[in-house]
Amino acid sequence: MEPATAPRPDMAPELTPEEEQATKQFLEEINKWTVQYNVSPLSWNVAVKFLMARKFDVLRAIELFHSYRETRRKEGIVKLKPHEEPLRSEILSGKFTILNVRDPTGASIALFTARLHHPHKSVQHVVLQALFYLLDRAVDSFETQRNGLVFIYDMCGSNYANFELDLGKKVLNLLKGAFPARLKKVLIVGAPIWFRVPYSIISLLLKDKVRERIQILKTSEVTQHLPRECLPENLGGYVKIDLATWNFQFLPQVNGHPDPFDEIILFSLPPALDWDSVHVPGPHAMTIQELVDYVNARQKQGIYEEYEDIRRENPVGTFHCSMSPGNLEKNRYGDVPCLDQTRVKLTKRSGHTQTDYINASFMDGYKQKNAYIGTQGPLENTYRDFWLMVWEQKVLVIVMTTRFEEGGRRKCGQYWPLEKDSRIRFGFLTVTNLGVENMNHYKKTTLEIHNTEERQKRQVTHFQFLSWPDYGVPSSAASLIDFLRVVRNQQSLAVSNMGARSKGQCPEPPIVVHCSAGIGRTGTFCSLDICLAQLEELGTLNVFQTVSRMRTQRAFSIQTPEQYYFCYKAILEFAEKEGMVSSGQNLLAVESQ
């Protein structure tokens, strides 16, 4: 199929013959790509936007297009709904806006007011969504496309608590090479003395050409760079602006107006149910001896730094459902939302729930689609949702890696009956305790779920791991590895008894795994299970790849560098016990770190 070249629309901006030819060439190249990935072709006006930003250099414009697409994909900037929370509040916060005046060259003026930014109250990807949304509104204008953008970073009245280094890096990276606008200059106004250190870090990332466009100014110096007619009153200008109400003008009359880039970005997101497991052997897998050498070479600090590389990557996807006002009370922690692309959806039932939301994510296992459901420790107001999920997903095994309370803080609710023969009713589902077995490191409870609507009963095995310390990670992985085997064996036995797997009637049901937030110990447990499964089958594994891929399905999985390093240690401990490496010398260096 040949790519179609988008026709020049009647209302398109006036271009020179050379610019029109460059636009046709750009569209021809880009639409070869859109045909390949079966997405809609790019329009003429969108093409012009990217070409304007690179002065109609076709190759540089193509590079910008892919940088922009990839940045939006990584930051989850897709299907924006500016009339819905939390994006609406972020837009209307006034921390970022576009002035209604231009500089003498015709450039649009964007203003970021640092004192209005509170990192501890904001979700970074929502801040970036608002930034993208408002910048997109600015570059919809042909005049802005042609004449560029001036960016003012107003630090007057701000303090260190208003500053976020990681956000600053992302904004500058965006402006310098991932957004279709000509960046004329960046004016940093009223910077405190402490700003010199973080700015020196940020400036190292910039090319000389971009660095030359950044100027740090006192408030009294701004009028030497822009006339007063272009500046707000607090910067010595004449523009009257109420930051609390100014951005209302940028909200569309209809929510969620079509964005041609949504389709182009979404094709690269992992679909919730259609692909095979993301955990398949990759090109950079290590043998166990290579892993020993790798950990000894990098040492503990190096592995911690490796985790930071993973942590810095923002989730691939969106959190609209988690952040919807009606669902916020169903999240145990406000900063642990659930990806829309992989979330478990409940069946809406009359009198039970008005939403299909639960903070739970499908997660792949080694060469197995949806092997786990990673979820938070149930809250009292989500007990019924939890058991509905267990029933609807035909779950046979539940793994709990926390206690009800740790360190004096509530970590999970008591969502199942603790004593033999006791029962709890959750709507039309009644859960009965058939028996409890207390082991050294875990407790095993056999539960029966009775669906009174369907008049069916099922057995579920509940495991609670008890040897994870209140703080940090276990000193040895031995008990967790043994526990992992017990869980695997129980799942295999339950599936075999169910008979569905051998008859091919349905895929193996997922194991529900939870801790408190559903990302730290849950991610550690699942990562270890995946890595050991691959090691046992192929003799190779890749921890970095496993955790990175896991976070595309259960965002923020593995919360700390300590948990990440524990995965490496646990694998080496397992390998030594199984005789995969000689005990002693090779592992002594690892253990002594």
Swiss-Prot record:
Tyrosine-protein phosphatase domain location: 303-574
One term of GO molecular function: non-membrane spanning protein tyrosine phosphatase activity
Active-site residues, as the UniProt record annotates them: 515
Keywords in alphabetical order: Acetylation, Cytoplasm, Hydrolase, Protein phosphatase
One GO term describing the cellular component: nucleoplasm
Catalyzed chemical reaction(s): O-phospho-L-tyrosyl-[protein] + H2O = L-tyrosyl-[protein] + phosphate
SMART domains: CRAL_TRIO_N, PTPc, PTPc_motif, SEC14
Name used for this protein in its record: Tyrosine-protein phosphatase non-receptor type 9
Native source organism of the sequence: Homo sapiens
